[in-house]
């Protein structure tokens, strides 16, 4: 779960130092292509082009962009995700600031669902987990693909996208 927390934090990072900290949590001391030493200011610049703006985002981190058909944020998917959070008794701490279908908020919901699933064997929680993972599997591969194809991407961000894809694939196998 530490990796999921670190991926959540990576996609919510506000600056180069937060990106570096989350990245090192994801990668551990040294891991394949992750063992290089990136210029974190360059990573921050690429991160902003991909996920923040102010220009058009190269890889929007919102499920509604990929699932609602018009590349719009705050669509039907956002409200569906908000409903799933509500079923868990959760509310986004960024409500009215950051759309509920942001990748980091969805990863945070996975952490909450997994925590609840470990504490109870309620069928409803297991079904909600399955529904939420199906939702993530419907859009995260598209999101990761956008990252990997984006002209502004950076090897560090590409590595995180690959880790996210690998984690999601492993979840589907459980």
Regions picked out by a protein language model, each given a short descriptive name:
Residues 1-174:
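Surface/interface-facing alpha-helical segments and adjacent flexible terminal/loop regions used
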């Amino acid at each position: 779960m530490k990796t999921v927390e670190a991926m959540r934090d990576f996609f919510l990072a506000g600056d180069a130092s937060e990106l570096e900290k989350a990245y090192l949590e994801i990668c551990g001391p040294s891991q394949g292509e992750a063992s290089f030493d990136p210029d974190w200011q360059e990573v921050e610049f690429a991160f902003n082009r991909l996920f923040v703006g102010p220009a058009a985002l190269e890889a929007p981190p919102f499920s509604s962009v990929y699932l609602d058909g018009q590349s719009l944020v705050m669509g039907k998917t956002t409200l569906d995700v908000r409903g799933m959070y509500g079923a868990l008794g959760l509310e986004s701490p960024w409500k009215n600031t950051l759309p509920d279908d942001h990748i980091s908020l969805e990863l945070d919901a996975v952490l909450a669902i997994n925590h609840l699933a470990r504490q109870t064997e309620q069928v409803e929680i297991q079904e909600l987990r399955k529904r939420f993972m199906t939702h993530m599997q419907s859009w995260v591969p598209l999101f990761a693909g956008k990252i990997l194809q984006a002209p502004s991407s950076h090897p560090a961000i590409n590595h995180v996208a690959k880790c996210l894809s690998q984690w999601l694939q492993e979840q589907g196998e459980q």
